[in-house]
């Protein structure tokens, strides 16, 4: 009897497999949108460098079939917003989001023409520092690198969709149904304004809305033998830490990099910019009490600040004037920097 049942089950499976699949299976892309972005990376950056988790976590979770269904007409429903890991205006996060996260609380500006308009705003300790502080054994203040943007991180849209959305504040707010004067609507206004502002002298910048866009910009600026680095773990925020072993990327030589910083937006937007005359460092971050490693930090030092605004918060924190001293800062959790791969 068991043999008869097994034979019937096998026959049923064979019959089922011989039937046509629903939804035209031959036209269904078996790969996800994220996998497509990884293959794009491999074509553009053929050096077999690993794909770090912090980058992979940004890729769209949508399947190719769902992505295709969004192509025409383009609309973002609440269910798509959730499945695509976008920041929906009706989410509980945005009901409690502080307006200071992006609009008023940006203590680390990535636009070098940025200046404070209010003299009573102070810069948190450790946001900016001098290059000489990156020495093994030094105890320094580590700024808060685990911000609310990281908590509410969205994903990139598939490039085919992102490219169809006009990068205009009103168009984005209309597509996502953002009410005027809400925190997210204000963030959209601010992000678009920052992205459309003129670059500083010697700076090349682009706001990217897809993983492929970011890869294209990094390759255009640095070539195709590159790697991407970041301070991955949000350990050591807002407290004193000890600097462990320090390594200068590319031998500590003055070089160029492409740094990308996330902006608050319904879908992932990164402000990427290439600035000459910088040094990039990797440093072990140790506990002052136990001397144990709690993180690996990436820091960038801008050697030439001559084109910066005299009111930039770096000069508020450290003193000095544009072009007078170098300015260093950590690549915060959620940001990343692309550099030429070490030859050693």
Locations of the language-model features?
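Folded, disulfide-stabilized extracellular/luminal domains of secretory-pathway proteins
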Residues: 163-344
